[in-house]
Amino acid sequence: FAGTTGGSATVYRSTNGGSSWSLVNSGLPSSGINRVEVAVSPSSPNKIYAVYGASNSGFYGLYSSSNYGNTWTQKSTSPNILGWEANGSGTGGQSWYDLTLAVDPNNSNTIYVGGVNIWKSTNGGSSWSINAHWYGANGLPYVHADHHHAGFRPNSSEFYLGTDGGVYKTSNGGSSWTALNDGMNITQYYKISQSQTDTTLLIGGSQDNGT
C-alpha cells in the first residue's frame, strides 16, 4: 500500500511487489485533503488504516478497511490530532510536513498517529487520547515535535518515533518515553556568531533544539 500527497491524495495497492499498482479509494475522501499515510495491521493483514491531513494541514479523518483496501469506512474526524493543542482543539496543523501512522503488531485495534504530537487509539480509530506532547503540556510525556516515521521492534513492545529532534522509544504503550539521541549530531544550526571581546566565546541558534 502507498499513500500520495496533494489535493487528490489517495491510496494505491500492489499485489505483485510493486510492479503495478491499482487505486483502492472506495469510501475515501477526494477533496479538502493534502496528504494520506497508510499502515497495515501485522496481526490482521486484511485490516488497513489511512489517516488524512486536511487542506489546512489539520486532521481530516481516520479511515479503516477490513478487506485489504477494497472498501473504506470513516472512523473519526475529531479531535484535531494533527494540531498543536494537547486537547485536540484548534484548527490546522502540519500534515504537509509531518505525518506518520503505525499499528500495534499485537492488537489490530491499537494505532498511533504522529504529527506535532503523538496520539493513540485503542478502538480502531473511533476515539483518541494524546500520548505525548511536543513540549510536555499538562504533565504529559515529552516527545520532540514533527514525527516522520514510527515503527515497532519485532517481537517486542518497543515502539519508536523518528522526529526532528531525534529518536524516541516507549516500551509501555506511551505512558513514558525515552530519548535515544546520545551521540547523534542532530542539532541544525541556522546562525552562529562570535563575541567581539572574547574570541573563545561563540553562540549559535539551532532548529528547535535551543541556543
Label each residue range with its predicted role.
Residues 1-211:
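Beta-propeller blade termini and top-face loops
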